[in-house]
Regions:
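A short glycine-rich, hydrophobically flanked beta-strand micro-motif that places a catalytic Asp/Glu
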Residues: 107-122
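Short histidine-centered catalytic/ligand-binding loop motif
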Residues: 70-93, 149-154
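Long, well-ordered alpha-helical scaffolding segments within enzyme catalytic domains
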Residues: 84-109, 162-164
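Active-site microenvironments that recognize anionic phosphate/pyrophosphate groups
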Residues: 1-67
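Short, low-complexity, charge-dense intrinsically disordered segments
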Residues: 172-192
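Divalent metal-coordination and catalytic microenvironments
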Residues: 28, 58, 74, 92, ...
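A short, glycine/Asx- and small/polar-enriched loop/turn
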Residues: 124-130
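Conserved His + Asp/Glu catalytic blocks
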Residues: 1-25, 127, 135-171
Length: 192
């Protein structure tokens, strides 16, 4: 399994960011997801971004433990919990809360594991970009669904779940002017 060996995987097909956030790691898939693109809609789809705010974004995990496995991360490339701003902390917690509500309705999740791994010894696969895992759970799911030798037993494809989240009325656009706010932030950070 290439992702265990540290292969970060390919960039989204045919897309390169037009603007990276200040301090972004160009090899980090979360920084790539937070970047600005000429075609933002296609980029968000290919980067599996299902929600974003001024300080954080939520990305479906390409290698899920369970259906709906979500990563919530700050837009900034920051590796330690103590380095997050109050706004980043608050927005991340709000995003996690919103997704527990959405997943309870959309995929009938009955419970959730929410956690984070700080640094490689604790299991962090992306130690340079802090992120929380939200893993939906169901009664009798036997901990996590099996992942054996590149064969994953997941009840719904990532494409189907991404589309279902987008189709949800009023979802995910919690910030009407996310792109405008992001562009303002880029100018403020000296990148616009």
């Amino acid at each position: 399994m290439s992702y265990i060996a540290g292969d970060k995987g390919p960039a989204p097909t045919g897309l390169e960011p037009s603007t990276w956030l200040d301090g972004a790691d160009h090899h980090c898939f979360l920084c790539r997801a937070a970047a600005m693109y000429d075609d933002q809609q296609i980029a968000r789809r290919q980067c599996l971004v299902v929600d974003e705010g001024p300080h954080t974004l939520a990305v479906l995990n390409l290698y899920p433990y369970n259906n709906g496995h979500l990563l919530v991360a700050p837009r900034r490339h920051v590796g330690q919990l103590s380095e997050l701003s109050d706004d980043e902390h608050l927005e991340a917690m709000h995003t996690l809360s919103r997704f527990t509500q959405l997943y309870a309705e959309l995929i009938k999740a009955e419970g959730f594991n929410i956690g984070l791994n700080l640094n490689r010894p604790a299991g962090a696969g992306v130690p340079g970009h802090h992120h929380w895992h939200l893993v939906p759970r169901w009664t009798g799911d036997s901990n996590f669904m099996l992942v054996t030798g590149d064969a994953r037993v997941i009840s719904q494809s990532i494409d189907e779940l991404w589309s279902a989240i987008q189709a949800k009325k009023g979802w995910p656009q919690r910030h009407k002017d996310t792109k405008k706010k992001h562009e303002e932030d880029l100018r403020k950070w000296g990148k616009g």
